[in-house]
Amino acid sequence: MKNRLKGKTALVTGATSGIGEAIAGQLAELGVNLIITGRRKERLEKMAAVLEDEHNIKVTIGTFDITDRAACEKFINSLGADPIDILVNNAGGAHGVDPVYSGDFKDWDTMIDTNVKGLLTMTRLISPGMKKRNSGHIINIGSIAGHEAYPGGVVYCAAKHAVTAITKSTKMDLTGTNVRVSQVSPGLVETEFSMVRFKGDKDKADKVYEGMQPLTADDIAEIVVFVANRPDHVNLLDTVVFPVAQSAATMVARTSP
């Protein structure tokens, strides 16, 4: 596959683990300079040292909470005038599986603030530069939950449906420019996602992937890199990625233990 990404700069949010970490790693392999952000400073520093050493690229880290708009603005302003060619809005997550009549307000706020407002903030801060340069690519990490609803997912599904709408509307807003806008929407991916959703209950988290082979973070990263590496005139708007055992949000073929 032709490498069209070498020498570009990508900003990846939520890069300290899982899909974000995998995306950063695979972009680094193609010679992409990185700006990686998250809340775990030590983890970001370790990643930066390894990626710079192994791939001879520049890695900048940003330690802040994506839900803190002022912190986002301060960090982006600190980067100066160097262009960000690719924005990967990866930070997100689900908290709890409560039905709407007993949901936790704090969990709801966290999901909306992270999945929706954080994504909007980063897009608002970075897209003007892309528009001015008439070049760039915004890639949002969505979910099958952004295409289907399911029980116990009322706010997470709503948040990811919002991401789908934001992706489509952003593409429309940038019509007439050469800025590309994409979304990658995974199904079941085995990462820290379920541990966070079930608040550290490993037994419940493991059952999500029981009796089937889920996707890995690297599987999704490979798709993101593929989307980013298309020719400049090619825009993949939304790519849904399932493990072969999954056909819908709640339709999964499982084998007995």
Which residues fall in each region the model found?
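Conserved glycine-rich cofactor-binding loop
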Residues: 9, 16-17
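Active-site helix of classical SDR
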Residues: 123, 159
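Substrate-binding pocket helix/loop in short-chain dehydrogenase/reductase
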Residues: 98-100, 104-112
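Conserved glycine-rich Rossmann-like NAD(P)H-binding loop of the short-chain dehydrogenase/reductase
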Residues: 32-47
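Residue(s) in the substrate-gating loop at a strand-loop-helix junction
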Residues: 143
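The beta1-alpha1 cofactor-binding region of Rossmann-like NAD(H)/NADP(H)-dependent oxidoreductases
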Residues: 42, 63-74, 105
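C-terminal helical subdomain
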Residues: 183-187, 191, 203-249
